[in-house]
């Protein structure tokens, strides 16, 4: 089974988590992204899928600006939102991850392709 869909542009790891009393908590920006991402999953009727198989994920990052960025700074917020939105059980199921820089897009987005790995 293969899923192709688009999710909102996430905050970077650095702006998503904050240190508080010697532990890390989700920032206001991170909490808002989680709400927006789960709403998008519901809109796409992908919430509650609870995929339990091993997965291959391909991401195309289409940023909102031309600012330079590291491709590995945006996966965490997205993957956590997919877990909380119950698209999959946990992001540890991802055995293969391919991340590609796309083109500047108004508002930014991430194009996602998720494939179930056949064992």
Model-identified regions with their sequence ranges:
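Acidic, proline/glycine-enriched N-terminal capping motif
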Residues: 1-119
């Amino acid at each position: 089974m293969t899923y192709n869909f688009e999710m909102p542009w996430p905050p970077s790891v650095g702006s998503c988590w904050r240190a508080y009393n010697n532990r890390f908590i989700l920032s206001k920006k991170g909490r808002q992204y989680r709400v927006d991402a789960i709403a998008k999953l519901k809109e796409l009727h992908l919430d509650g899928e609870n995929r339990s198989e091993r997965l291959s994920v391909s991401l195309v990052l289409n940023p909102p600006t031309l600012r330079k960025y590291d491709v590995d700074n945006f996966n965490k917020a997205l993957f956590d939102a997919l877990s909380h939105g119950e698209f999959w059980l946990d992001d540890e199921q991802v055995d293969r991850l391919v991340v590609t820089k796309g083109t500047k897009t108004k508002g930014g987005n991430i194009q996602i392709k998720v494939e179930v790995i056949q064992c």
